[in-house]
Amino acid sequence: MQGPRKATRMVKTGSKQAAPAAPQLHPVLQALLSRPTPAVMGVLNVTPDSFSDGGKFLAPNQALAQAKRLIADGADLIDIGAESTRPYGGAQPVSADMELRRLQPVLAEIVALGVPVSIDSMKADVVAWALEEGAAIANDVWGLQRGDEMAALLAARNAPVIVMHNRDRADPSIDIMQDIAAFFERSLDVAARTGLARENIVLDPGIGFGKTQEQSLIALARLDELKSFGLPLLVGASRKVFIASVSPSEPQQRLGGSIAAHLAAARRGAGIIRTHDVAETVQALRVLAAIEDKR
């Protein structure tokens, strides 16, 4: 078990001792990250088995209605996924063809609503199709580390990508922040090798993925250490099970814990917050910003 963090503790990122100069971001990312509060990404799962809302939005009319609700609630972008990647297992892998069958009836209509859409998929074929349909961002839960095809595609399309930390299984013996940093170094190496521009990359510590519940808390507590990469940070702690480790609850009962985690992330440098509960998160972030402005 890892001990408490010292105030001076920093993640080592290879030979880098200081943050690299901030790159000129891709225009889509620049627009999202130029707001007075973190951008809010609304989650839309067109799956039967996602951990907190599986099956609710599988029908095309339900998915479109939910996308409209998320935007009305203040979502700055929509993250749509057609394969559950639920933390702690239990999801059934699906083929690229199945993902496409779930996405084809709805993606173009959601893109037409006028906010950027990210496609939550680890399959390059699915992402390629989604980009053709107007999706703006790829969200890869394996951080470009399931072969070079994804990175090469995104480089060719000049498309932004969310690079998420992940592990096949949690290991309570490791320093999770060192593991996250090393993972991101490998992802950035893949990007450089395939020509994917650094300014197209957002880093996500992957709360709940390949981590013990304590490690998810540590990743949130020490999120600011990842600013050493000089890249935007995204955090998605919405309804994750680490909340229940602090306050026992079912996924639908974790709104308070989700907001607490996201406010902590915002104070530590997160520029994008991924959530199921958009209206409440937008309100919380605005109030936090108003309080901080009075200091």
What does each model-identified segment do?
Residues 2-16:
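Short Lys/Arg-rich cationic patches that frequently serve as NLS/NoLS or arginine-rich RNA/DNA-binding motifs
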Residues 65-81:
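Catalytic domains of carbohydrate-active enzymes, especially glycoside hydrolases
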Residues 12-28, 35, 52-69, 85-116, ...:
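Active-site-adjacent loop and "lid" segments of alpha/beta metabolic enzymes
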